[in-house]
Amino acid sequence: MASSEEDGTNGGASEAGEEKEAPGRRRRLGLLATVWLTFYNIAMTAGWLVLAIAMVRFYMEKGTHKGLYKSIQKTLKFFQTFALLEIVHCLIGIVPTSVIVAGVQVSSRIFMVWLITHSIKPIQNEESVVLFLVAWTVTEITRYSFYTFSLLDHLPYFIKWARYNFFIILYPVGVVGELLTIYAALPYVKKTGMFSIRLPNKYNVSFDYYYFLLITMASYIPLFPQLYFHMLRQRRKVLHGEVIVEKDD
């Protein structure tokens, strides 16, 4: 499930286990991390802007969404796969976001791009694909712009406002688009048995991709409200200065 809840891309290097390291080296590591993260976020902002322009240009020229995915798929695949670096950033400690949170966010996008839309060509012209592509594109332009300006210590209020308001509409739209796309893929997956492992085989294991997709769709039911309301709490905290008290489970 696409989510933009993490707010940790601040360029701060982790100092866990580095208590005896010279302060000068820690500062250099922090500077290097900040430079790299600034470059990364500028590149990702530019990439999603290119994607947005390509989508608008295609629709203006063709007047239809059919063929849109095919026309932008290389750019989409490159920049979405490039986002795997965000997991690496967490692993090496240059951002304070949880590895699990980053992993879920990035892997859900990779799953939709490579294992659904890329692999099941008959669904590429579905309107639901355009739905999540538009939601992702606006979300990512806003998110990476927010990170870039934050790293540069010059965050325009509009970018901050957009970061914590656009998701109110875009997040549900993206989720609906993803769910409808997976649903559209089900008949093809069931008919072809793609990615499924049948018994008997020498490993004595089985896997049914069709039922895996059903379980994936069902997982949105508990996850979406949890993530959405977390983001709403973050919005109140950042934009309105409310103190949010998290209840212990």
From Swiss-Prot:
It catalyses: a very-long-chain (3R)-3-hydroxyacyl-CoA = a very-long-chain (2E)-enoyl-CoA + H2O; (3R)-hydroxyhexadecanoyl-CoA = (2E)-hexadecenoyl-CoA + H2O; (3R)-hydroxyoctadecanoyl-CoA = (2E)-octadecenoyl-CoA + H2O; (3R)-hydroxyeicosanoyl-CoA = (2E)-eicosenoyl-CoA + H2O. Its main location: endoplasmic reticulum. The active site is at 171, 178. GO terms for biological process: fatty acid elongation; sphingolipid biosynthetic process; very long-chain fatty acid biosynthetic process. Residues 57-75, 121-126, 183-212 are lumenal. Residues 1-36, 93-102, 142-164, 231-249 are cytoplasmic. It is found in: Endoplasmic reticulum membrane. The keyword DNA damage does not apply. The chain crosses the membrane at residues 37-56, 76-92, 103-120, 127-141, 165-182, 213-230. It is an enzyme of class 4 (lyase). It is linked to Defects in HACD1 may be the cause of autosomal recessive centronuclear myopathy in Labradors. Belongs to the very long-chain fatty acids dehydratase HACD family. This is Very-long-chain (3R)-3-hydroxyacyl-CoA dehydratase 1. The gene is HACD1.
